[in-house]
Structure formats: C-alpha cells, structure tokens
UniProtKB/Swiss-Prot annotation:
The keyword Magnesium does not apply. It is found in: Endoplasmic reticulum membrane; Golgi apparatus membrane. The chain crosses the membrane at residues 40-59, 61-80, 91-107, 111-129. This is Protein YOP1. Residues 60, 108-110 are lumenal. Residues 1-39, 81-90, 130-172 are cytoplasmic. Oligomer. Keywords: Endoplasmic reticulum, Golgi apparatus, Membrane, Transmembrane, Transmembrane helix.
Length: 172
C-alpha cells in the first residue's frame, strides 16, 4: 500500500513539474511566482479547480465561459498577429468566426438553454475543443458547417445582385 502511495505521489510530482515547465514559458507567470510565495503550477491548478467548480455548479458560469472564450484566444490571436507564420492567423481567425456565430445563436436560444443541465460545463468543454490547436475544433466546424452554408449563401447573394438593375444615381 505504501509503495502504491509513493508511486502516485511520484506521478503527481512529475505532472506538476510538467505543468511548471510549460508555465515557465510565460514571463507574467514567472513574475507572479516571484511576487507570491506560491509555485505557479499550484496557482494554475488551483485556479483551474475553482474555475471548474464554479462552472459546474453554475456560479457565474456564463461570465466565466465567455471570459475563457474571449481572453485566452484574444491573447493567442495577438501573438499570432505578431508572428511571421500565417498558419496561426488562420487558426485564430477561424476560431473567432465560429465563436462569434455560436455567441450570436446563443442569444436566440438562451431561454431554452436555461433548462439544459450542465449547459455551461458543456459550453466550456466545447470552447476548449474549438480553441486548442491540437484538436482543430474551430477548423472542423468551419469546414464542415459554416463554409458550405457561406458558399451557398454567397452564390445566392451574387446571383440576386447580378439580376437586380442598378438604381440611378440621385442628382441634386
């Protein structure tokens, strides 16, 4: 039993060390760790735990999911704009199109969503899936749903505009 507990402790320590290594890439978190006597990995895990509990128990869940859906992608979008590679620009531009569409649609069905248990937990997971470059969620939604609808709509609009005679310019 003690050997199993020691194995679990080693795995947890390795996991925390990996998180600390990843978080060390961000100067703001390094500065945070120097200012506050809490290791950045523990602070990040604590913040993640509190965020998860709040969303799960629907405490300011709408605000928190929109905060996650805006600030994290906004940060990486700004970084992408400053980088020379166009691929990361595509990732974040696609994310914003999908996120914007879902946010827009959500305003119309908000009354129905109130009755769906764990809606904000599901929404949080969806936002994470959409934004992670590893999952390419936004790209998948865009290419399978939004793009085909857009191309069909665009074609219809162009045909309607082509068949409509131009109005004469007003002269005064």
């Amino acid at each position: 039993m003690a050997a199993q507990a020691q194995q679990i402790q080693q795995k947890v320590e390795y996991f925390v060390a990996q998180i600390d290594k990843e978080l060390s890439r961000y100067p703001a978190l390094k500065k945070f760790e120097q200012t506050v006597p809490v290791p950045k990995a523990y602070a990040a895990l604590g913040a993640f735990g509190i965020f998860t509990l709040f969303v799960f128990f629907n405490i300011a869940a709408g605000f928190l999911t929109n905060l996650l859906g805006f600030f994290v992608p906004a940060y990486f979008s700004l970084k992408a704009l400053e980088s020379p590679q166009p691929q990361d620009d595509i990732q974040w531009l696609t994310y914003w199109v999908v996120f914007g569409l879902f946010t827009f649609l959500e305003t119309f069905i908000n009354i129905v969503l109130y009755y769906i248990p764990w809606y904000y937990t599901i929404k949080t997971l969806a936002i994470v899936w959409l934004m992670l470059p590893q999952t390419q969620g936004a790209k998948m939604v865009y290419s399978r749903i939004i793009r085909p609808v857009f191309l069909t709509t665009q074609k219809t609009v162009h045909q309607a505009n082509a068949s409509t005679p131009a109005a004469p310019a007003e002269t005064h």
